[in-house]
């Protein structure tokens, strides 16, 4: 495989799509050696097919605000790969949404879903609409307008979206209600639903829970106990909340959360009512974390900075893509943490990830670490198909097993003679091989 030749071709076809190109390059570098062991992959032009989405839907979303003014946003659904199951991936409502970000997320989702052991392909979608500052009625009208187009390309056996940034339980409810009205059908076409109407237990916290199960497995490879370890978390939404909850349950101490305005350092630990307050912060819609320091006087707010300057044992970026850069990596490495794990999708820049791997630090990519969220979505799909509802204990046990299986799959390909595990390479190879074998079995389609 000539990585540079493939990347040059993609850069010509998709200029300016930095996030997408970064994600593709990382995977190609990781899988190059194993790809070259399979000449049949080259004959079938497997990589050239795998890096391009099967289908992209772009549409306008006209809606009316409370004052009667008409707005027009862009909507997208990237159906990236269906080799191992129906397209599966979230919907993101945020002003930053564009095709590059959605293609990167859909590409990553393909391999992440493959790692879960569940039959799910990869997809992603969303809009440049922002829920911030919008009334409940405005959000409802937007979701209904969005679904009038999305309904044409989704279905329980075709494409099953879920939530993501800006799309929580409320938005999923409005989307599902409109889908039901348009199709006259009740089925598992969306995940992240409420428990009363087809949702799965522990879904909101599943990404964070799964991440800590994975991190615990990583630490155990070096005979390290997570109990008593300090943890830096970025963000303060559902993912950060789930991670903080499970970290505390496992005996670790979470000392930071962050927002666009800066970060909170709480040396006493973010636990109990403090974790619950994170949800109040998110529900306020203000997207700032400073009020935490007013609510809990022992905490300190540090404006316009990131939490990676704090000396901790475990660092967990939980906010958004590329939030931890090369300079942040240098700060972390200087403080000699035990582990860094991407809980957000591609939470580290390529430079930061390379520095962690070069330092032989325990470092794992988002496609493995945060797969618990989509795994639990897959479990919701299963429950919908079977017309039943599992208990919290049953779902959590299945999630724990899936994260253990993902860890084993990552280790399988890349454990080095000195014992170091390159989780980035391992996750990419494990996901790639599953998708590649499925694509080869199904012919040139």
Whereabouts are the PLM-identified features?
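Flexible, glycine/charged-enriched surface loops at secondary-structure junctions
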Residues: 21, 37-44, 117, 154-163, ...
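Structured beta-strand/loop patches that form or line metal/cofactor-binding pockets in enzymes
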Residues: 40-71
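Glycine-rich phosphate/diphosphate-binding loop of Rossmann-like nucleotide-binding domains
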Residues: 191-194, 199-309
């Amino acid at each position: 495989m000539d990585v540079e030749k493939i990347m040059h071709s993609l850069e010509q076809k998709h200029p300016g799509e930095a996030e997408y190109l970064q994600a593709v390059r990382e995977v190609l570098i990781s899988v190059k050696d194993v790809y070259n062991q399979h000449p049949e992959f080259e004959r079938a032009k497997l990589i050239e097919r795998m890096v391009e989405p099967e289908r992209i839907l772009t549409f306008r979303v006209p809606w009316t605000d409370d004052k009667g003014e008409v707005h027009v946003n862009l909507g997208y659904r990237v159906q990236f790969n269906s080799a191992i199951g129906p397209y599966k991936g979230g919907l993101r409502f945020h002003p930053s949404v564009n095709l590059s970000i959605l293609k990167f997320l859909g590409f990553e989702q393909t391999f992440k879903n493959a790692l879960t052991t569940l039959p799910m392909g990869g997809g992603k979608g969303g809009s440049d609409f922002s829920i911030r500052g919008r009334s409940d009625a405005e959000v409802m009208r937007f979701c209904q307008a969005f679904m009038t187009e999305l309904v044409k390309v989704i279905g329980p056996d075709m494409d099953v979206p879920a939530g993501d940034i800006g799309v929580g339980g409320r938005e999923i409810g409005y989307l599902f209600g409109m889908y039901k009205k348009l199709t006259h059908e009740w089925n598992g076409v969306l995940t992240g639903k409420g428990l009363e109407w087809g949702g799965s237990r522990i879904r909101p916290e599943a990404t964070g829970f799964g991440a800590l199960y994975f991190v615990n497995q990583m630490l155990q490879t070096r005979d390290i106990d997570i109990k008593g370890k300090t943890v830096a978390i970025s963000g303060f939404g559902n993912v950060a909340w789930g991670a903080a909850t499970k970290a505390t349950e496992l005996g670790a101490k979470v000392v930071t959360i962050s927002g666009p305005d800066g970060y909170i350092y709480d040396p006493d630990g973010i636990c109990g009512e403090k974790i619950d307050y994170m949800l109040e912060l998110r529900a306020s819609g203000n997207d700032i974390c400073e009020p935490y320091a007013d609510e809990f006087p022992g905490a300190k707010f540090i404006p316009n900075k990131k939490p990676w300057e704090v000396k901790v044992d475990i660092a967990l970026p939980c906010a958004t893509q590329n939030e931890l850069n090369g300079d942040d990596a240098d700060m972390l490495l200087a403080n000699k943490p035990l582990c860094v794990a991407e809980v957000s999708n591609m939470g580290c820049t390529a430079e930061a990830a390379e520095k962690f791997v070069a330092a032989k630090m325990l470092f794992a990519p988002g496609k493995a670490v945060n797969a618990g969220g989509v795994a639990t979505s897959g479990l919701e799909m299963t429950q919908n198909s079977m017309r039943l509802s599992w208990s919290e204990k049953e779902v959590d046990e299945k999630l724990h097993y899936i994260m253990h299986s993902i860890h084993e799959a990552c280790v399988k390909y890349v454990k080095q003679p000195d014992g170091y595990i390159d989780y980035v390479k391992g996750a990419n190879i494990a996901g790639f091989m599953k998708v590649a074998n499925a694509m080869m079995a199904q012919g040139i389609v």
